[in-house]
UniProtKB/Swiss-Prot annotation:
Keywords: Cell membrane, Membrane, Phosphoprotein. One of its GO terms (cellular component) is plasma membrane. GO terms for molecular function: actin binding; identical protein binding. Residues 230-247 have a biased composition (Pro residues). This is Adenylyl cyclase-associated protein 2. It is found in: Cell membrane. Residues 223-322 are annotated as: Disordered. It holds the Pfam family CAP_N-CM. Belongs to the CAP family. The keyword Membrane applies.
Length: 476
């Protein structure tokens, strides 16, 4: 009886132990399993986005903390925007695409983060780091790629290009004095380059929603978007690679091909190789037959030239579709020809205008914008009210610009022919020119304009301690 009681006690302890082990094995790990048909596992696309945040965004955040101040605060906002996008991508990997109006509601957390970043720049225009803040503010709209189809990658590149306008200013100010700012620029631009690579791999033609989960809605996805789950720790480093596989062809000698053998056989003939040449009689020699000289050079019929189908001369110039549209905060005016009625009237202080390859056209920009760039245009006229940043003309020809209000700086680079009509309020603007010709400034005088040429030729002398450069005055 005693033995039976002891056996029962041991059996009971074994059952309790098995129950404990079973509970530990059967419980799903955190974030896994299915709830209401939604798989809680992390999709490869989300893991790749986590890698982007843990590497590029983390590097940018580290360099921003080194600079501290407004730059650090701004960078923390950028980090928050990427976390909001990570939460949205997690939802996309688990739910099917809803109606467009539902998508707009689901995108609201990201939109609010972007707006917060742009508002911070506007509220800190007096900051010593304003160019840093502007680089981020003008390009953070790249996070809106999730609403772009069918090619979100190029959209991110355009926003990256908008950032370089200001990062170039940062490099100009600090590249010889403080390399911390150079590291900051590099780490920030790397974010968008890496994001383009991520999009090419996981969302090439637009956002890829789940095909199996339930349809997303504000109710079903609110918990994901609002909770903003923390990022998982970075994965451990991969194990060291094994030894390389043996090279199978190490002991194999290359066997000579028949064509190569024949070639060496001919070369080994030495002087005997000329025995195979055919003798040319005098009647076929041009210098001994006057009739051949009279005919001039005759092409061999077997060597008629056929133009290559890929020859650039045979290709007609490609026609591009004219563009006049607002993308984010950037007005794109491209490939306009023979248009003198182009007008941009609904403008904001945050917006920039980029004008590219327009010919024989005129554009009027009303209101106040941040900056205007005229690139690769010919016989183009630009009329604008106010610009708070810079107007830049580059790689262009025969440009006319009329300022109705104010502009602090006008830059002219690699341009032939540029006429600037200034208003009374714009007479204090700075004009910076390089590698350009036929530049004239027209200032108002007695209800008319008086023209002044911008010097193109300069005289440089050594005054004993430094070089002194001044415009060369050539009298006719």
């Amino acid at each position: 009886m005693t033995d039976m009681a002891g056996l029962m006690e041991r059996l009971e302890r074994a059952v309790i132990r098995l129950e404990q082990l079973s509970a530990g094995l059967d419980g799903p790990p955190r974030g896994c399993g299915e709830v209401n048909g939604v798989n809680g596992g992390v999709a490869p696309s989300v893991e790749a986005f986590d890698k982007l945040i843990n590497s590029m965004v983390a590097e940018f955040l580290k360099n921003s903390r080194v600079l501290a101040g407004d730059v650090e605060t701004h960078a923390e906002m950028v980090h928050g925007a990427f976390q909001a996008q990570r939460a949205f991508l997690l939802m996309v990997s688990q739910y099917q695409q809803p109606q467009e109006n539902e998508v707009a509601v689901l995108l609201k957390p990201i939109s609010e983060k972007i707006q917060e970043i742009q508002t911070f720049r506007e509220r800190n225009r007096g900051s010593n780091m304003f160019n840093h803040l502007s680089a981020v503010s003008e390009s953070i709209a790249a996070l809106g790629w999730i609403a772009v189809s069918p090619k979100p990658g190029p959209y991110v590149k355009e926003m990256n290009d908008a950032a370089t306008f200001y990062t170039n200013r940062v490099l100009k100010d600090y590249k010889h004095s403080d390399l911390r700012h150079v590291d900051w620029v590099r780490s920030y631009l790397n974010i968008w380059s890496e994001l383009q690579a991520y999009i090419r791999e996981h969302h090439t033609t637009g956002l890829t929603w789940s095909k199996t989960g339930p349809v997303a809605s504000t109710a079903s996805a609110f918990s994901i978007l609002s909770s903003g789950p923390g990022l998982p720790p970075p994965p451990p480093p991969p194990p060291p690679p094994g030894p390389p596989p043996p090279f199978e062809n190490e002991d194999k000698k290359e066997e000579p091909s028949p064509s190569r053998s024949a070639l060496f056989a001919q070369l080994n003939q030495g002087e005997a190789i000329t025995k195979g040449l055919r003798h040319v009689t005098d009647d076929k020699k041009t210098y001994k037959n006057p009739s051949l000289r009279a005919q001039g050079q005759i092409r061999s019929p077997t060597k008629t030239h056929t133009p290559s189908p890929t020859s650039p001369k045979s290709n007609s110039p490609q026609k591009h579709t004219p563009v006049l549209e607002l993308e984010g905060k950037k007005w794109r005016v491209e490939y306009q020809e023979d248009r003198n009625d182009l007008v941009i009237s609904e403008t904001e202080l945050k917006q920039v205008a980029y004008i590219f390859k327009c010919d024989k056209s005129t554009l009027q920009i009303k209101g106040k914008v941040n900056s205007i760039t005229v690139d690769n245009c010919k016989k183009f006229g630009l009329v604008f009210d106010h610009v708070v940043g810079i107007v830049e003309v580059i790689n262009s020809k025969d440009i006319q610009i009329q300022v109705m209000g104010r502009v602090p700086t006008i830059s002219i680079n690699k341009t032939e022919g540029c006429h600037l009509y200034l208003s009374e309020d714009a007479l204090d603007c700075e004009i910076v020119s390089a590698k350009s010709s036929e530049m004239n400034v027209l200032v108002p005088q007695d209800d008319d304009y008086r023209e002044f040429p911008i010097p193109e030729q300069f005289k440089t002398i050594w005054d004993g301690s430094k070089l002194v450069t001044e415009p060369a005055e050539i009298m006719a």
